[in-house]
């Protein structure tokens, strides 16, 4: 039995025992491995960084999906950037009110390998007739498409390699252009305790671009370093501050089943700790 040592941070990291190596390949864009671990189930890593595990992926995918969709309240067209493992697609597809799901993934091999070796992530969602799967660069897609979306979810890797451009100012500007009135953009933004500069940079790039911008958090064990942040940008100011009962009713009406998300978690996730507020130049969470 060998180990998989993550290489995201210098001098600090995590190690997974490899109980069974399922697949390893260098794709056109990155080095991909999928293996089994007794504690976390099947695990996928790209370029030395753990991307997802069967054990806790539901936290990440539910929070990046249901927070913006239920805050919007009437999302019909959803764009997923990245998300090749299919977990985000699975959660978006739970919303029967969504009429069209466009998913843009740069690496088709990731999609193929995850269909084969991580089927529990997508649970058949790649066969959903509402899906338009595009194998292309996410930055190029949002910069050139004429389509408009109610919710955009950027499920990117860390800002290294193929995912680096998905944290750029040009990317955020292009996403804003692609949003319908009342639209929402959410992106994964790393763990602020270890990646505070990424949060600070994203704040600077979204400030002034959206009527309301902020971050929200969730604790995902796989992503070491504490709670993970997700960036939020909306074209309407009030969507982040909906009454709790409104969110509870929307959640009930949606009929979706979750393991982590609920309306109380939704509202509470936007309460950022003081060191994050200071980093993004905000006095409070309003």
Swiss-Prot record:
Chief place where the protein resides: cytoplasm
Entry-linked PROSITE patterns: PABS_1, PABS_2
CC per GO annotation: cytosol
Pathway named in the protein's UniProt entry: Amine and polyamine biosynthesis; spermidine biosynthesis; spermidine from putrescine: step 1/1
Residues of the PABS domain: 1-235
Reaction catalysed by this enzyme: S-adenosyl 3-(methylsulfanyl)propylamine + putrescine = S-methyl-5'-thioadenosine + spermidine + H(+)
Molecular function per GO: spermidine synthase activity
InterPro entries, alphabetized: PABS, PABS_CS, SAM-dependent_MTases_sf, Spermi_synthase, Spermidine_synt_N, Spermidine_synt_N_sf
CDD domains recorded: AdoMet_MTases
EC category: transferase
Biological processes, Gene Ontology terms: spermidine biosynthetic process
Residues where S-methyl-5'-thioadenosine binds: 30, 105, 137-138, 162
Catalytic machinery residues: 155 (proton acceptor)
Subcellular location, record wording: Cytoplasm
Pfam families per record: Spermine_synt_N (PF17284), Spermine_synth (PF01564)
Positions annotated to bind spermidine: 61, 85, 155-158
SUPFAM superfamilies: S-adenosyl-L-methionine-dependent methyltransferases
EC number: 2.5.1.16
Record key words, sorted: Cytoplasm, Polyamine biosynthesis, Spermidine biosynthesis, Transferase
Family: Belongs to the spermidine/spermine synthase family.
Assembly information from the UniProt record: Homodimer or homotetramer.
Function: Catalyzes the irreversible transfer of a propylamine group from the amino donor S-adenosylmethioninamine (decarboxy-AdoMet) to putrescine (1,4-diaminobutane) to yield spermidine.
PANTHER family named in the record: SPERMIDINE SYNTHASE, SPERMIDINE/SPERMINE SYNTHASE
Entries under HAMAP family matching the protein: Spermidine_synth (MF_00198)
UniProt name for this protein: Polyamine aminopropyltransferase 1
Species lineage: Bacteria, Pseudomonadati, Pseudomonadota, Gammaproteobacteria, Pseudomonadales
């Amino acid at each position: 039995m060998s180990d998989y040592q993550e290489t995201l941070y210098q001098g600090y990291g995590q190690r997974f025992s490899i109980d069974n190596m399922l697949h390893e390949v260098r794709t056109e864009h990155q080095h991909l491995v999928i293996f089994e671990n007794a504690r976390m189930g099947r695990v996928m890593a790209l370029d030395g960084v753990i991307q997802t595990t069967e054990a806790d992926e539901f936290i990440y995918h539910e929070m990046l999906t249901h927070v913006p969709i239920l805050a919007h309240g009437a999302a019909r067209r959803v764009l997923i950037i990245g998300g090749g493992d299919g977990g985000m697609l699975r959660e978006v597809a739970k919303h029967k009110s969504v009429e069209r799901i466009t998913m843009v993934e740069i690496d088709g091999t990731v999609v193929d390998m995850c269909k084969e070796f991580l089927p529990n992530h997508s649970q058949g969602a790649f066969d959903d007739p509402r899906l338009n799967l595009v194998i292309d660069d996410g930055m190029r897609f949002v910069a050139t498409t004429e389509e408009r979306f109610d919710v955009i979810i950027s499920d990117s890797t860390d800002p290294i390699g193929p995912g680096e451009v998905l944290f750029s100012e040009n990317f955020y500007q292009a996403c804003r252009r692609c949003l319908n009135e009342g639209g929402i953009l959410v992106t994964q933004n790393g763990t602020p305790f270890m990646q505070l500069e990424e949060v600070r940079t994203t704040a600077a790039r979204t400030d002034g671009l959206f009527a309301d911008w902020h971050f929200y958090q969730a604790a995902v064990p796989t992503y070491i370093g504490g709670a993970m942040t997700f960036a939020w940008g909306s074209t309407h100011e009030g969507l982040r501050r909906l009454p709790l009962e409104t969110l509870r009713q929307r959640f009930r009406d949606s009929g979706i089943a979750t393991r982590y998300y609920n309306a109380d978690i939704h509202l509470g996730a936007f309460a950022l700790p003081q060191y994050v507020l200071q980093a993004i130049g905000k006095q409070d969470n309003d």
